[in-house]
Amino acid sequence: MKQKIRNAYEITDAKISFVSLVDKAANKRQFLITKAENGQANFASYGRIVKADAETHHVTGVVYEPMVEDSHGNYMTEAEITKAAYWFAKNGDKVDLQHSFEPMEGATVVETWIAKADFQIGDETITKGTWLMTVEVKDDAV
């Protein structure tokens, strides 16, 4: 049974080719935003960074959570998130910085996965069906 999300629209068949590393000025944290390759952001997901390792230069964050309204009033089911993540793994795999829509040198997706069960990373609870990603960022300025 599909859960209702107040005033939100379901995203289906998302084709995601970029993941951006961006700053959110209000709280000075980095977030991930997903968008279409054609340069038009068809939806944004301000996922939280759940782990950062300065030694390996790896940043792990939530790309999209199931049944959670995003910043544009949209949501995705677990099944649609899985489809989008698999499409990204096969066709996307690009990282940019600050919505530039230009592939970022020195940033590589090293891991992308769907949570198979609820679990914890530090103090963060990750819900089953959440799309997570680890990006290696070689640029110390980022």
Task: Enumerate the predicted regions with their spans.
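Signature of dsDNA virion morphogenesis modules
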Residues: 1-142
